A protein has these predicted regions:
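Solvent-exposed edge beta-strands and adjacent loop segments
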Residues: 1-73, 112-127
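Homeobox/homeodomain signature
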Residues: 25-27, 97-99, 103, 119, ...
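Short, surface-exposed linear patches
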Residues: 58-59, 88-94, 119-122, 134-136
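Beta-strand secondary-structure signal
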Residues: 65-69, 96-98, 110, 130-134
């Protein structure tokens, strides 16, 4: 069994003008208390005559996303970058995400930062922090050596 903390998430904070761009990443971990991954799959369902009334399913698309939440740590490079996008629109929200899983996979994908929250909570709490990182396009998945 692998604990959730054994996974690593990096957010692209700057990129070169090369094509494709080369990203500089910052680890998004300080203050982070919860991470969830959703495939957001699109499924086509067919009921064929030979299925005797039971469906056949094909996954035909996906819009993967990471939902991240925790406490705001001002001065942390990754959180500060995400926070700077709170009121940005359009391509100003675009970035890259790199995920290294506890199972030894590295996932890299263009991404969009959404639903940024940099404050809130009970009056005695540290400010909350959360965002959704929407993957754009097909991720590159490789084995970590």
């Amino acid at each position: 069994m692998n604990p959730v903390w054994a996974n690593e998430i990096y957010i692209g904070t700057s990129a070169t003008s090369a094509t494709p761009p080369v990203w500089t990443y910052e680890k998004l971990c300080k203050g982070i208390e919860s991470v969830s991954f959703a495939s957001n799959e699109q499924n086509q369902q067919y009921y064929f005559l030979c299925g005797n009334g039971f469906a056949h399913n094909e996954v035909t698309g996906a819009a993967p996303a990471l939902t991240i939440s925790g406490r705001r740590i001002k001065g942390d490079a990754a959180q500060d970058y995400v926070a700077s996008k709170q009121f940005a629109l359009g391509t100003d929200r675009n970035t890259s995400v790199k995920i290294v899983t506890a199972e030894g996979k590295q996932i890299i994908c263009d991404a969009t930062i959404g639903d940024v929250v940099t404050f809130g909570g009970n009056t005695l709490d540290v400010n909350s922090f959360s965002c959704v990182i929407y993957l754009n396009g097909e991720p590159t998945v490789t084995d970590v050596t």
